[in-house]
UniProtKB/Swiss-Prot annotation:
Organism of origin: Parengyodontium album (Tritirachium album)
UniProt protein name: Proteinase R
GO cellular component entries: extracellular region
Keyword line: Calcium, Disulfide bond, Hydrolase, Metal-binding, Protease, Serine protease, Signal, Zymogen
Binding-site positions, Ca(2+) 1: D308
Disulfide bonds: C142-C231, C286-C357
Amino acid sequence: MRLSILLGLLPLAPRPPAVDAVEQRSEPAPLIEAQGEMIADKYIVKLKEGSALASLDAAMEKLSGKADHVYKNIFKGFAASLDEKMVEVLRAHPDVEYIEQDAIVNINAEQRNAPWGLARISSTSPGTSTYRYDDSAGQGTCVYVIDTGVEASHPEFEGRAQMVKTYYASSRDGNGHGTHCAGTIGSRTYGVAKKTQIFGVKVLNDQGSGQYSTIISGMDFVANDYRNRNCPNGVVASMSIGGGYSSSVNSAAANLQQSGVMVAVAAGNNNADARNYSPASESSICTVGATDRYDRRSSFSNYGSVLDIFAPGTDILSTWIGGSTRSISGTSMATPHVAGLAAYLMTLGRATASNACRYIAQTANQGDLSNISFGTVNLLAYNNYQG
């Protein structure tokens, strides 16, 4: 069944018998209620692998004013406003794998004061004040910051940052969160990988929130866009965002990782098991928890078996909008440490997109952290600089 035929059903709002023209299924496709703050009448429709998509462009024309997003890369599907009848028609269609209600996603940050994280990831013990690193510093890599945007004109980025996609009227970072994360990844003073290229993808509004359907579209964009960029040493996606569990978001993140992008995500700031949050609960990507300067799990950081690594996340000083700096806390701040470290290691030839998270875990400082719950890794990111 071609996607154009499938999506062509939507504008008609037919009663269930309208699917008689296509092959019937024995049971309707699952209808998943996303955890968290759901959005009324907004749905993400995931098609089965192997569904023919030759007429996707025609389908998009038929959905003019109906589809919010059409996904072509990380998985096949779309997001749209659907009433109950439309949902039931689509659930009966043999090409639909599942339908999930859209939900709100937020940044994972809190306000705080004081810098220290870079020194910690280049040392085997806490309390140091010097960041030690190889001067290659992530050169030849690209890091996508999927967030509130990036203030590319900030002097700390030295012309290495640019906005490449926005889902809002303005590409400007009116929040600061994305710029802060980008600074920890690759700014001149506060960055782990000081020579990487930074690409901003604005999926969250200036209040720091957005829809899962938009997050998925941002990942879909990255999966295609990076192939047209000059990133010979590797590509990373940093996502310091999260919300309640979502099958669609997890699937998108897993497929972005599989496409050749190292995906680092925030564990979340709920002091709870990260398996109940997305994209943190996706096992094939790199889920990052936060620590403080005393090597304690940050009081807010999520935990559990889905975490891969911890990194500094309390009182992290980095770039801010308006050409300034600010110190904030969250697993949002820990994640760019790991994203930057992945880019750094890729340039050195020690890691690739497929194995970077595993390599970081294998070479981490082990057993140094306190306030770690049973079943959670006791691993703190470390760059293993030997110079």
